[in-house]
Amino acid sequence: MTCDVMGGLYLAYDLLGGENGPLARLTKIVNYSVLLVLLFLTTMGFKFALIVGLAFGTALGLHFDRAGKGIPDTNRFLLGTAILRSVAIIAAVWIKENYILALVMGALVFVMSLVLPRLKISPATLYNTGKRPQLTWRQVVIAGIMMLVAVASGLFGASITHGDAKTISFVIKFGLTFGFAIFVTSIVSPLIEWYSDNLPPQSFGTGGVTLFIIGFVIQAIPSFATIFDMTK
């Protein structure tokens, strides 16, 4: 299903004008959402990774879209992305039945999403474009700062809720995973941005058709397995 969705998006991206078309921003959002879902999935579980990855990927895609066009982050924009991130954190932690921690972490994420950009620590400061992955000390420092902020915020929330060892372990794991995700994304994002802006739209169309075919084959595997099982 994921292959079908991304295949349809890339094909539509080609048909509707590429980087100058209406789907350019949406394509970036999908690219970063998929990347962050996969990164969070390494340690945080499927439901948590899906909720947080989609929300944070959407916010990141919007940040980079504006940065690429030279549009500054307005107060209204920062407020919108802060709400998106905080709601996602609340929902993801709420599912784990730690309700007070969910509200505290959501509030902290909301505040940090508004404060950090004022200190020049935001996804927009990581924006870059190039033909290959890039790594600079600036990326390392920003990823490290955001990881420490995430861990400290989680521990603060755990202390307020009088969390046990399991809760403390969870918030530390989230903070480390978040920092790792920011670090990896900052390395590969120049490559993603360059190809998004410079590849001919026809390449996305070809990729879209390929993903459609892959998605069809994957979904057809259970049917083929059933048919072969019946013929035995």
Predicted regions and their residues:
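Alpha-helical transmembrane segments and immediately adjacent membrane-interfacial amphipathic helices
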Residues: 1-14, 28-193, 203-227
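Short, strongly hydrophobic alpha-helical membrane anchors
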Residues: 231-232
